């Protein structure tokens, strides 16, 4: 019986640690950039877009595709940073679990 109680306490402790890690990630700002920093985005760790900055010299009405590509690159850069940090901070909680 004591073993089960010990396991429950350990599970609760891990749950609290995981919650703290999730909050740390959510409160972190991630900055994604395109080539030459012409487009910059900021996301919170919960993947909410906070800002989008586009340098005026990249805005060309004759070539919207370049701007679209730069925005996509900046967004993907930030999202991959979030994914990497999430895996680093939360991956330790799921190692060895059967799912």
Swiss-Prot record:
Primary location recorded for the protein, binned into one broad class: cytoplasm
GO CC entries: bacterial nucleoid; cytosol
Pfam families reported in the protein's UniProt record: YbaB_DNA_bd (PF02575)
Disulfide-bonded cysteines: none
An MF annotation (GO) of this entry: DNA binding
PANTHER family: NUCLEOID-ASSOCIATED PROTEIN YBAB
Function: Binds to DNA and alters its conformation. May be involved in regulation of gene expression, nucleoid organization and DNA protection.
Self-association and partners: Homodimer.
Name by which UniProt lists this protein: Nucleoid-associated protein LL0120
Organism expressing this protein natively: Lactococcus lactis subsp. lactis (strain IL1403)
Species classification: Bacteria, Bacillati, Bacillota, Bacilli, Lactobacillales
Gene for this chain: ybcG
